[in-house]
UniProtKB/Swiss-Prot annotation:
Enzyme Commission number(s) from the entry: 2.1.1.-
GO biological process: box C/D sno(s)RNA 3'-end processing; tRNA processing
GO MF term (any one): rRNA methyltransferase activity
Protein name, entry field: Fibrillarin-like rRNA/tRNA 2'-O-methyltransferase
One Pfam family of this chain: Fibrillarin
Length: 228
């Protein structure tokens, strides 16, 4: 029998009795898998296992994220939605609150739209995260921005979007992929430089999590937005 313990608001530790560390979210749309994830039923509630190998946010939770800014009722802007793996879990956590998810590639967006089926709080936006003004008529002020965009100007993208959409005192979460910034530089140097860009432009960094072994040369930063 699986054991369930709430780790963060609407994020659960799942003990399936095999010693493997797992987390999951309550299924907003029961019996629907988004990326082949395992479904677990406990006391008439279905949970979706959150695979850290396919989600940087999932990996950061497994690796010791101190605080989860995304909670029930959080309004979220998600940059770099891809096919919807992580946004679907974020939508589970937020429950009735909107998750605006931006993806640049039309082909991937088609897959993402399929994963949105039945999720009334998950809104797919075909757009360029570098140009927040393009979706400013759709997205309202949000509590959290999560970014997973493999571009050299990753930190700047977060700042641009924060200026448009993030409430003062809200949270920015960003998965920095060192190799997307500079292939030749030491990842630690890149992480420090990206952190500095954020700190100089309105964010107070409150957590940093290395997400190896799930992703190589990736660091997830959490910052509080002081506004600019």
């Amino acid at each position: 029998m699986a054991k369930i313990k709430e780790k963060f608001d609407n994020v659960f530790e799942l003990d399936l009795g095999d010693g493997i560390k797992r987390i999951g979210t309550k299924s907003l749309v029961p019996n629907k898998r988004v990326y082949g994830e395992k479904l677990v039923n406990v006391k008439n509630t279905e949970y979706r296992v959150w695979n850290p190998n396919k989600s940087k946010l999932g990996a950061s939770i497994i690796n010791g994220l101190k605080e989860m800014p995304i909670k029930k009722g959080s309004k979220v802007l998600y940059l770099g939605a891809s096919a919807g793996t992580t946004p679907s879990h974020v939508a589970d956590v937020a429950e009735d609150s909107p998750v605006y998810a931006v993806e640049f590639a039309p082909r991937i967006m088609r897959e993402f739209i399929e994963s949105c089926e039945g999720r009334k709080n998950l809104f797919p936006i075909l757009g360029d995260a570098n140009k927040p003004e393009e979706y400013a008529n759709i997205v309202e002020k949000v509590d959290v921005i999560f970014e997973d965009v493999a571009q050299p100007n990753q930190a700047e993208i977060l700042i641009k979007n924060a200026k448009w959409f993030l409430k003062k005192g809200g949270y920015g979460m960003i998965s920095i992929k060192a190799r997307s910034v500079d292939v030749t530089e030491n990842p630690r140097v890149i992480f420090e430089a990206q952190k500095e860009i954020m700190e100089q432009n309105g964010f107070k960094i409150v957590d940093a999590i290395n997400i190896e072994p799930f992703e190589k040369d990736h660091m997830l930063f959490v910052g509080i937005w002081n506004g600019q």
